[in-house]
Amino acid sequence: MRIVCLIEDTEGSEGKNGCAAAHGLSFYVETGAHRLLVDLGPSELTLKNAENTGTDLRDVDTVVLSHGHYDHSGGIMPFVRRNTKARIYMQRTAVGDFYSDDGESAGERFRYIGIDPEIADLPQTVAVDGDLRIDDELELFTVKHANHPIPFTNKSLLVRDGSGYARDSFDHEHYLVIHDGKRHILVSGCAHKGMPNIMEAYLGRYNAAPDIAISGFHLMKKTEYSEEEKREIGEIARQLNEYPTKYFTCHCTGMKAYEIMKSVMGDKLTYVHSGDVIPTDWI
C-alpha cells in the first residue's frame, strides 16, 4: 500500500519532491486492487505535484470526491483530459450552490465555493445516494446522526436556496473506507460533520476503529481562537484519542489547531504536507 499527499496547504519538509502547496487537498492511494484518488485539490497544480512524486495518473481507476467544494474538485476537469477511464464517485447532492460568508468587510461577502457543475455530467461520474459498497476493498459511508458538535468554523459555510442563504448541512459529504488485507483505513476530506461523529459512525458500522484515519478537521481560522474555541479543539482531540487509531491530518485543520491537538494526542497525531508519504507498513 502507498498513500501520498499530492497537495495540501503547506509545503513538505525541505521542499519534498518539489511539491507545491495550495489551499486544497488530494491523496493518491495504491491498494492491492486499485489506484485511486481522494479529491483532486483546487487546480491543475495537483497534477503537476503528482508528476513530481512519480505518480502516473493514467493508471488511476477510481476517484472519490469527498464533498462539493472547489478546493477538493478543481483538478478533476484537468484530470479527465488525461484519464477517461476512472470512475468518479460523489454524493448526488455535491452539485449544490455552496457559498462562504467572508464577512461584511470582504469585497464580495458571499463567495461561491462549489464545484464545476460539468463534473456531474461526465459519463464516468457516479452520483451516490448515501452509503455505497464499491467492492471488497472500497466503501463509502455518510454520517446520519451527530452526537457531538460540528466544527465551529462551519458557521460561515452556506448553501443558497430560493429565499437566500442557509447553513450547509453537509449532506454532500461522504467518507472512504479502504480494506486492504489486514489494514482498515478511513479517509475523509474536511470532516465538516465533525471528526468525532465520523469516528463514532465508523465504529457503529464496523464494530471496530480504523487503523489509520486521514482527514482535515476543519478547525482553521484566519483570526485568533477564543478561549472557548481552544477548549473545543482540545475536547475534539481528547475524544479522538480514545480510539486506538493513528491520525494523519492536514489542510483545513490549520497549524495552530494542530499544535493544540498534538499536545493532547502526542504520537497518535501527525501533520501531513504536500508530497509526504503516509507510512502504513507498521499496521
Residue ranges and their predicted role:
Residues 1-18, 155-167, 218-228:
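Glycine-rich phosphate-binding "P-loop"
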Residues 2-53, 169, 173-188:
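Conserved beta-strand hairpin/beta-sheet module of binuclear metal-dependent hydrolase folds
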Residues 87, 169-175, 179-274:
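Cap/insert and terminal regions of metallo-dependent hydrolase folds
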